[in-house]
Each structure stands twice: as C-alpha cells, then as structure tokens.
From Swiss-Prot:
Compartments where found: Cytoplasm
EC number(s) per entry: 3.4.21.92
Name this polypeptide is given: ATP-dependent Clp protease proteolytic subunit
Keywords from the named record: Cytoplasm, Hydrolase, Protease, Serine protease
Domain of life: Bacteria
GO biological process, one term: protein quality control for misfolded or incompletely synthesized proteins
Assembly notes: Fourteen ClpP subunits assemble into 2 heptameric rings which stack back to back to give a disk-like structure with a central cavity, resembling the structure of eukaryotic proteasomes.
Principal subcellular localisation of the protein: cytoplasm
Classification via HAMAP family: ClpP
One Gene Ontology MF term: serine-type endopeptidase activity
Active site (UniProt): 106 (nucleophile), 131
Family as reported in the entry's similarity comment: Belongs to the peptidase S14 family.
Pfam families assigned: CLP_protease (PF00574)
Organism the protein comes from: Verminephrobacter eiseniae (strain EF01-2)
Length: 202
C-alpha cells in the first residue's frame, strides 16, 4: 500500500526521522513497511494483491529469516487475487503472522487463516466471516455451465484449504460456508481461523 493507493482512506500521515545525514520523511505505510508490517485494507483485487505480493517479496529479500506482520481489515473480493497473496505467503521463506483488525470477510478471512500456525491473531472486537465464492456470468448456456463448474471446483479447493488451516472437518466447512457465517474474535479462535485473541501488545 502506498500513498497513491490509500488516498481513499483520507490524509496519509507523514513521519519525519532525524539522522546524521539530516531529515527524511516517509508516508506512514512506508515507515511501517521498514518494521516489516504490511496492510490489506479494503477489497482484495488485482491492484491490492500486486502491492501485497511485492511487499512480501521485498521483505523476504531484506531478511529471509525474520517474520512479516500482515494486518487485515478487508471485506474480501477476487478469489484469484487472494490466491496470489496466499501462494506468495506460502512461497516465501519468512513466516507471515496475520492479525485481524476490524473485519476479515470472505477472502480476507481466508488470508487471515493462511498465516503461520501459532501466529494468527485477532483483536478482541474484530469480526470474521466465511462463505462460499460468489460468481456471476452472462452469455450462452454452455459458457454459463463452464463457469458454474469452475466455481464449484474453486469452492471445493477453498474448503479443503480452510479445513486444513482450521482443523475443522471438511463437511463442517462445507456446511458453514453455504451462507455467510459470522464469527466473533473468540469464536474465530475456537473455530481455528486464528490462534489467539490479543487485547494488548505483550
């Protein structure tokens, strides 16, 4: 996330640092990136996925042995964009610790659960929502049928990964994701989407 991409969030604060070579200013997100903190705020789409993937790869090149913190407040969005982030999280060497602030819904919840085991967190008043992938298609009947088959395959793929990440039986995941399934922070921990609800930084 850079200053151009976050203009919709309002004014971007700047941080000024003093050094022996003078002053240097950063937008707040660039400063936090130096501390290995990445944000996903808003919809998951090709643009946000591109930024997250680039930051993950950059931080791996900076230090492949140090954890990356990934803060999520997202209503979800594109499955293919989300899977690009998911695959990169698994591809890189550093552990990616996830933390839900506000709401992690749909693909946002999927990415929250994708964090390194034991390093997935939620703040106490955050919410999580899981459901099956959504799709819409217009065109000839044959094209609609092809897309329907593809979305069913995608649903099966996502459910299998969620079952693996949460420890829940696949049948329960299939049942729960039939409709929007909302969980509080504590319920998310019990479900296995996160490992811990944190009230205060230790």
């Amino acid at each position: 996330m850079n200053a151009l991409e976050t203009q919709g969030l309002g004014m971007i604060p700047m941080v000024i640092e003093q050094s022996g070579r003078g002053e240097r200013s950063y937008d707040i997100y660039s400063r936090l990136l130096k501390e290995r903190v990445i944000f996903l705020v808003g919809p998951v789409n090709d643009q946000t996925a591109n930024l997250v993937v680039a930051q993950l790869l950059f931080l791996e090149s900076e230090n492949p042995d140090k954890d990356i913190s990934f803060y999520i407040n997202s209503p979800g969005g594109s499955v293919s964009a989300g899977m690009a982030i998911f695959d990169t999280m698994n591809f890189i060497k550093p552990d990616v610790s996830t933390l839900c602030t506000g709401m992690a819904a749909s693909m946002g919840a999927f990415l929250l659960a994708a964090g390194a085991k034991g390093k997935r967190f939620a703040l106490p008043n955050s919410k999580v929502m899981i459901h099956q992938p959504l799709g819409g298609m217009q065109g000839q009947a044959t094209e609609i049928e092809i897309h329907a088959r593809e979305i069913l395959k995608t649903r099966e793929q996502l459910n299998k990964i969620l079952a693996e990440r949460t420890g829940q039986p696949l049948e329960k995941i299939q049942r729960d994701t039939e409709r929007d399934y909302f969980l509080s922070a504590d319920e998310s921990r019990e479900y296995g989407l996160v490992d811990q609800v944190i009230h205060r930084r230790s």
